[in-house]
Amino acid sequence: MSDIKKVVLAYSGGLDTSVILKWLQDEYQCEVVTFTADIGQGEEVEPARQKAVSLGIKPENIFIEDLREEFVRDFVYPMFRANTIYEGEYLLGTSIARPLIAKRQIEIANQVGADAVSHGATGKGNDQVRFELGYYALKPDVKVIAPWREWDLLSREKLLAYAETHGIDISKKKNGGSPYSMDANLLHISYEGTVLEDPAQEPEEDMWLWSVSPENAPDQAEYVELEYRKGDIVAVNGQALSPAGVLTELNRLGNKHGIGRLDIVENRYVGMKSRGCYETPGGTIMLKAHRAIESITLDREVAHLKDELMPKYAQLIYTGYWWSPERAMLQQMIDASQATVNGWVRLKLYKGNVIVVGRESKTDSLFDPTIATFDEDGGAYNHADAAGFIRLNALRMRIAANARNKRG
């Protein structure tokens, strides 16, 4: 018998977590509470309730919650204020969802008096780290059960056999479905496994579930205008929208125009390289637009400092340190920089491309056309000042050149 009496399981209703649910009941002889988060994965979450009930979970121990607004408002938006991108390409769609799920799991554990939490992340991936760092940051004494590190069900065939033996409904899996390991939320959908494990193999077109291919996107470009307030999008084409509403609309536009597909090999935190394919249509549009509005509203040195800090900030999110003090410190700096990031950006969407065609800030623009003009500026900029500026900046290089010449 285990000393664990009650565990909160992050539960999707799929094969893996349904097997985990039954395994927890059998191996730990404990009460299981299920938590299913709707973060915009694009499929019904209510079936998870019926699945949990069929596996013996009491109705009062089933938590299904719509977290889409919180996800975008408190996690996606703060991340995009930093123009966050991991290893030059990845927009962190999976990584940024884990802190919210971990947070809510711990809150439910405190609410129901659970002494443990559990997840379905494998022992090879980053998600086990992300979930568990979150758990410990928010509840230091919590017990964590990671079945993939304990059991011997280390293949899909063994999971299916266990499910059949224990009466777990697997009809959806047996009747087909995608061969890929997928993860989806309002920001992105990811694909891993099977043929993608050969990084030289191009994925089949029918793998991509969200977007049309750029080749098949409309031949007519579409324009979209985004309004920013303190670094966050508050309206699309003049229509005020909630954070989740903004991302939903940008996903629609991006999918229509073949925007946001990505095929990369990334360096996992656990040490291996992994090939993944991603569709992040709305996020791709957001990143381009945010950099555009910052280009006229941020001081040069502030913008450059943000760019220097961004890789570290991205690494913290990718590796699971959202709840760390260093991420919180960086977030305060990033958020402070956004006070003047107000205005609008106009974009042209065309066959996989996001093209900035206009930006304006009536209140906070640092772009002064009277100084930047190539025409007569009426004395706003004194060309002669450049000579001293250049000589002073060249001084150290002139000294170094003189030293080299003396050495022969």
Swiss-Prot record:
UniProt binding sites for L-aspartate: 122, 126-127
Binding site for L-citrulline: 90, 95, 126, 130, 181, 190, 266, 278
Primary localization: cytoplasm
Catalytic activities: L-citrulline + L-aspartate + ATP = 2-(N(omega)-L-arginino)succinate + AMP + diphosphate + H(+)
Transmembrane regions listed in the UniProt entry: none
Pathway: Amino-acid biosynthesis; L-arginine biosynthesis; L-arginine from L-ornithine and carbamoyl phosphate: step 2/3
EC assignment: 6.3.4.5
UniProt cross-references to Pfam families, sorted A to Z: Arginosuc_syn_C, Arginosuc_synth
GO biological process, one term: urea cycle
Domain of life: Bacteria
GO cellular component: a single term: cytoplasm
Binding site for ATP: 10-18, 37, 120
Molecular-function GO terms, alphabetical: argininosuccinate synthase activity; ATP binding
Annotated InterPro entries: Arginosuc_syn_C, Arginosuc_syn_N, Arginosuc_synth, Arginosuc_synth_CS, Arginosuc_synth_type_1_subfam, AS_cat/multimer_dom_body, Rossmann-like_a/b/a_fold
Localisation per UniProt entry: Cytoplasm
UniProt KW keywords: Amino-acid biosynthesis, Arginine biosynthesis, ATP-binding, Cytoplasm, Ligase, Nucleotide-binding
PANTHER family: ARGININOSUCCINATE SYNTHASE (PTHR11587:SF2)
Subunit structure: Homotetramer.
Protein family (similarity comment): Belongs to the argininosuccinate synthase family. Type 1 subfamily.
Protein name: Argininosuccinate synthase
Organism this protein belongs to: Chromobacterium violaceum (strain ATCC 12472 / DSM 30191 / JCM 1249 / CCUG 213 / NBRC 12614 / NCIMB 9131 / NCTC 9757 / MK)
